[in-house]
Amino acid sequence: MAILQDTEGFYYSTDEYLGNPSDYAIHNARLLASMLINNYGWTDYGCAGVFSAISFESQFNPQCIEGRRSEEYARAHINDAVGVGYVQWTPPYNIITWSDDRGLDWKLSSTQCQKLEAERNREDVQYFTSPYRIQYWQTYTGGTTPPYTMIEYTTATPEQWTALQMAAAWILFYERPESQYNVSNYQRNEEWVTYWYQVITGQPLPTPPTVYPPGTPIEPPSGDGRSKMPIYFYPMFRR
């Protein structure tokens, strides 16, 4: 496996994950948080919420293509169920074509930050709360109001929402995978919200939570009648 460094200082590999959380992933997470906080006004807690998902989707490899496939493959399957980039945009046109149309290089972290910003400002909407609010409220019977917009989410603070609520909101409102009803996914990502918050804020590195390889299936409770799918970005739910 060759680990290289791009012109922006981020480590990447064209054929492998970086490790969860390897020194490479931690390095990239800190740089990415700096971009999002300083250039776009995110909070460290908002970054941590999104990073909890990136831990499983790409392990902070900006050039990650699902299945360790090549860019040529992604371009040949531009409308298919192939995840690309930090958050595994699916289909690939969501990041590759979007970048090409603007004269940008999708492989750069700065480009992927611009894409997230376009989504955040509802220029290219990815964050939906309806009809997924119902599932959120069913999970949190106390009636806690979720972050209704991506701006609310990315500017969140620990005083507003718990790590579990941040994990659940991102899965339900942004990722929308087939396995969205499996609460164990929220609990899995909750640990990583806390982990990345400590990393970003400069606290001593905590012990990482349990590591799952990207694409590890998390089975829903037996007998619930729902499809058992990995927590991939499922195209019928992404727009």
Predicted segments with their positions:
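Short, surface-exposed acidic
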Residues: W42-A48, L205-P208
